[in-house]
């Protein structure tokens, strides 16, 4: 972690100094010293915030505020310092615009349509429900607590609070390796839908300065929609017929790809600005066109510093803007800020629980999804900033909104760190989401006794192989999963030997109800370390001779599981390497034209067979 922080600091410092060189040459050398001090201070604060498990963007906002206070911006505006700091207002405004464009571009690069197309109906129902209910609630909260006036001010205020942060959602899921979990897919899909809505309204804000009603507004909205659709079509055509071969060539050099990505981003943004379309929306869709290429992971790796650099420019200058406001706008609205922050942090998980209860997701999934998305977004901070500059937000509304957004980042990060403790504290109130069939019902409906049975926790390739083995022996297996789509699939497979049970595999009452201690084999196919340790302890106390097998992707977790009396650990990399060793020994001595051909063909057939057997849920496994 420390190496990553120092590397990012070095890269961003180099970019900052490079950007400041023309200013220095033009007589603006006063900028380099404070810029270096700000970035150095931000590095120290970032290390502290990382230790406190907070988003590092807060460090740049803090240093921006410190810079503004040092300049005395609370008592005088930027224009009053022109004589001593020539061009400062223009330079900071330019830095901010560059930061906004780069953040929007990288948001587009990281935008993955597969996040919503994998479970299109499920994600859309939850995501649209979340955004819709959130807009209604926070529209009311904006008028009730913040005192917004008019439709434009209230709806933009609500939008800025309802859309989750792609930065924080992605970081949280990656840290816990939950990207492919059901709650991770719900959180990511909701963020994707909210981001799309935010970009569309951002384009509307840039085009007309707000949201009006009437016939003229309907015509302008129609024209704006046509412009956005045309922009999307053009960048997608560029992506398919021009970018793909160009990027394939540029991947040979990280420097070429980096410079070309910056040029492409700024070029599309400039063209959109000249045509009257939002440059920010243009940069976002340019990022999508680049991120949709087959080389997405390579592109993200090589142009990743753009994200950090853009965030630094944006949030440093945002801090300066915040310090430019009258301090009384913050102090006089402390109660409003705290109230709205608590509403964001508390109400958004409740909305996920409400929307999640319709497709019958389990309480743990709903709570974890809600805790992951209960913050404002960096993109909506951009909207708030632009709305303030466009006159849609007053100084007071802007001060309230930015304060609420930043406080929601802090509280949300703390909540994500303690998300399992939060769930355990509130799960007693959510029993209505967790009604499970009893062991008696499973025995009655499927003829499966809860003794000497096989238990599979979660469904994936490992459980597929175990189930196939017992199907050949004519035995049924009990498969427990929290994914409603997988459960519905096996409920429809009347001839399958898999008996599906829709339940929370981390709920210890399930272990007793379905008599895990009387099973002949328990296989945990999810790499949930703490749950597997607790289940191992439960089985060791109840039935020490029962074989318990667990799956993990981590070597460290494998050793810890063995230390906690798990009988056998399927460490996927280890198993893959051992399996490949056998294939390697079998194929390597064949002539080059035949080497690995038979094994590859057999692997292709086996994978196709799995896909054909699983049908629609193949992409979910």
Q: What are these model-derived regions, one by one?
A:
Residues 1-440, 444-445, 449-450, 454-457, ...:
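Transmembrane helical cores of multi-pass secondary ion antiporters/exchangers
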């Amino acid at each position: 972690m420390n190496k990553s922080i120092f590397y990012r600091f070095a890269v961003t410092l180099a970019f900052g100094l490079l950007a400041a060189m023309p200013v220095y040459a033009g007589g603006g050398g006063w900028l380099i010293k404070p810029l270096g001090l700000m970035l150095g201070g931000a590095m120290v604060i970032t290390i502290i915030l990382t230790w406190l498990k907070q988003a590092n963007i807060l460090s740049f906002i803090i240093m921006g505020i410190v810079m503004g206070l040092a300049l005395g911006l609370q008592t005088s505006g930027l224009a009053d310092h022109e004589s001593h700091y020539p061009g400062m207002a223009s330079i900071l405004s330019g830095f901010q615009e560059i930061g906004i464009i780069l953040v929007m571009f990288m948001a587009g690069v990281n935008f993955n349509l597969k996040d919503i197309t994998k479970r299109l109906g499920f994600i859309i129902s939850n995501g649209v429900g979340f955004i819709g209910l959130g807009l209604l609630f926070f529209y009311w909260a904006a008028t009730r607590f913040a005192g917004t006036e008019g439709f434009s001010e209230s709806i933009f205020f609500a939008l800025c609070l309802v859309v989750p942060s792609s930065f924080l959602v992605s970081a949280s899921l990656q840290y816990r390796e939950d990207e492919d979990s059901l709650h991770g897919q719900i959180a990511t899909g909701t963020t994707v839908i909210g981001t799309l809505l935010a970009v569309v309204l951002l384009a509307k804000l840039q085009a007309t300065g707000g949201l009006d009603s009437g016939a003229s507004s309907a015509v302008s909205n129609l024209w704006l929609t046509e412009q956005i659709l045309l922009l999307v079509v053009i960048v997608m055509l560029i992506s398919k017929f021009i970018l793909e071969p160009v990027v394939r060539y540029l991947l040979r050099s990280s420097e070429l790809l980096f410079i070309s990505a910056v040029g492409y981003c700024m070029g599309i943004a400039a063209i959109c600005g000249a045509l009257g379309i939002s440059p920010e929306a243009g940069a976002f869709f340019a990022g999508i066109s680049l991120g949709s290429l087959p080389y997405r992971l390579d592109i993200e790796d090589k142009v990743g510093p753009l994200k950090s650099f853009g965030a630094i420019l944006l949030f440093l200058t945002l801090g300066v803007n915040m310090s430019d406001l009258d301090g009384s706008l913050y102090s006089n609205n402390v109660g409003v800020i705290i109230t709205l922050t608590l509403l964001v942090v508390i109400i958004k998980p409740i909305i996920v629980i409400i929307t999640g209860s319709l497709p019958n997701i389990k309480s743990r999934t709903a709570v974890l999804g809600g805790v992951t998305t209960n913050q404002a977004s960096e993109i909506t901070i951009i909207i708030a900033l632009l709305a303030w500059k466009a006159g849609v937000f007053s100084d007071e509304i802007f001060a309230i909104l930015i304060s609420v957004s930043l406080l929601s980042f802090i509280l949300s990060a703390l909540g994500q760190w303690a998300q399992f403790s939060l769930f355990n504290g509130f799960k007693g109130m959510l029993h209505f989401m967790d009604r499970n069939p009893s062991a008696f019902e499973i025995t009655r409906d499927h003829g499966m006794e809860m003794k000497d049975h096989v238990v599979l926790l979660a469904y994936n390739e490992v459980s597929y192989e175990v189930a196939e083995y017992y199907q050949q022996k004519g035995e049924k297996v009990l498969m427990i999963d929290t994914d409603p789509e997988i459960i519905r699939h096996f409920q429809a497979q009347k001839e399958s030997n898999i008996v599906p049970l829709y339940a929370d595999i981390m709920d210890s009452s399930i272990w007793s109800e379905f008599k895990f201690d009387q099973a002949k084999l328990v296989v945990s196919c999810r790499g949930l370390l703490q749950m597997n340790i607790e289940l191992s302890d439960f089985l060791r106390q109840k039935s020490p001779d029962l074989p318990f097998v667990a799956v993990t992707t981590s070597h460290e977790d494998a050793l810890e599981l063995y230390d906690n009396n798990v009988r056998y650990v399927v460490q996927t990399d280890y198993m893959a390497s051992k399996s490949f060793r056998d294939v390697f020994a079998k194929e390597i001595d064949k002539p080059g034209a035949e080497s690995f051909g038979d094994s590859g063909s057999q692997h292709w057939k086996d994978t196709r067979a799995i896909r054909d057997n699983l049908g629609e849920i193949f992409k979910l496994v």
